[in-house]
Swiss-Prot record:
Protein name as annotated: 4-diphosphocytidyl-2-C-methyl-D-erythritol kinase
Catalytically driven reaction(s): 4-CDP-2-C-methyl-D-erythritol + ATP = 4-CDP-2-C-methyl-D-erythritol 2-phosphate + ADP + H(+)
Taxonomic source organism: Yersinia pestis
InterPro entries: GHMP_kinase_C_dom (IPR013750), GHMP_kinase_C_sf (IPR036554), GHMP_kinase_N_dom (IPR006204), IspE (IPR004424), Ribosomal_Su5_D2-typ_SF (IPR020568), Ribsml_uS5_D2-typ_fold_subgr (IPR014721)
Binding site for ATP: 106-116
Similarity comment: Belongs to the GHMP kinase family. IspE subfamily.
Pathway: Isoprenoid biosynthesis; isopentenyl diphosphate biosynthesis via DXP pathway; isopentenyl diphosphate from 1-deoxy-D-xylulose 5-phosphate: step 3/6
GO MF assignments: 4-(cytidine 5'-diphospho)-2-C-methyl-D-erythritol kinase activity; ATP binding
Catalytic residue positions: 20, 148
Length: 299
């Protein structure tokens, strides 16, 4: 019998929760239920939040670092843990956990922070609780929490269609990015409810999309409604190809080298805050998970 907070398996406690970028995003329609249909290209960043997850033997789920403005029971971290906790699985392990988060990704930034947090919890607790679910099963669970959760669960850069749930592995070039948060948070419904949002971009095959300049159909709305986004993008575009990610508010510029990205960051105006990160096609979460499994097997 284990005691509360004692690790149940030898996996270390810290788990990455990486950011993502939408390298392009096109709205191709809207369903009767209001969900928007899209085509988008997801790539991860080697930058993000970090979760510390310690199993418990009393079936309690505790978030030790509440996020301001978000009730614990509504936090995707807690919701993901409780969803997996209730899933029937062939495991004798008590399903509880203490979870804390070192949060650096902004809310309402278009970097997928909440979805990534949920995916990290699902992937980590599936291992720690010995649930034995496949990534496909975890992705199906995650989809009920948010359309972006499955791509984080599966852990590979992907071309997404439908409402974001139809994923096809992709291999975009792993560039360096300067990501800027313009100092405003944009709730997704503000963009998707705007009557001027383009909702009829023609559906195209991935090969055609990759051979044309990338764009984001949400960008004109974000620039129109949020002066901070307009100013940040106008500044970035002086130095490199730049776009909005997701529905914003973060914007990003792409570079071939880390040094060139950092050089531009070093001259950014004081009112702009950002970071430099590498685009990666295999999620840092899955790299860490593979290492934990190999470490456990060696023991």
């Amino acid at each position: 019998m284990t005691t509360a907070n004692q690790p149940i398996c030898p996996s270390p406690a810290k788990w990455p929760s990486p950011a993502k970028l939408n390298l392009f995003l096109y709205i191709t329609g809207q369903r009767a239920d209001g969900y928007h249909q899209l085509q988008t290209l997801f790539q991860f960043l080697d930058y993000g939040d970090q979760l510390t997850i310690e199993p418990r033997d009393d079936n309690q789920i505790r978030l030790l670092t509440p996020i301001a403005g978000v009730e614990n029971e509504q936090n995707l971290i807690v919701r993901a843990a409780k969803m997996l906790q209730k899933h029937p699985g062939n495991t004798p392990v008590p399903r509880g956990a203490d979870i804390s988060i070192d949060k650096c990704l902004p809310m309402g930034g278009g970097l997928g922070g909440g979805s990534s947090n949920a995916a990290t919890v699902l992937v980590a607790l599936n291992l720690l609780w010995q649930c034995g679910l496949t990534d496909e099963q975890l992705a199906d669970l995650g989809l009920t929490l948010g359309a972006d959760v499955p791509v984080f669960v599966r852990g590979h850069a992907a071309f997404a269609e439908g409402i974001g749930e139809k994923l096809q592995p992709a291999e975009p070039v792993e560039k360096w990015y300067l990501v800027i948060h313009p100092g405003v948070n944009i709730p997704t419904p503000i963009i998707f409810s705007d009557p001027e949002l383009k909702r009829n971009t023609p559906i195209r095959p991935l090969a055609a999309l990759l051979s044309t300049p990338y764009a984001n159909d949400c960008e004109p709305i974000a620039r129109k409604r949020f002066r901070e986004v307009e100013q940040a993008l106008s500044w970035l575009l002086e130095y490199a190809p730049s776009r909005l990610t997701g529905t914003g508010a973060c914007v990003f510029a792409e570079f071939d080298t880390e040094s060139s990205a950092r050089q531009v960051l070093s001259i950014a105006p004081e009112w702009l805050h950002g970071f430099v990160a590498r685009g990666v096609n295999v999620s840092p979460l899955h790299r860490v998970r593979s290492g934990k499994i190999e470490s456990s097997e060696r023991r």
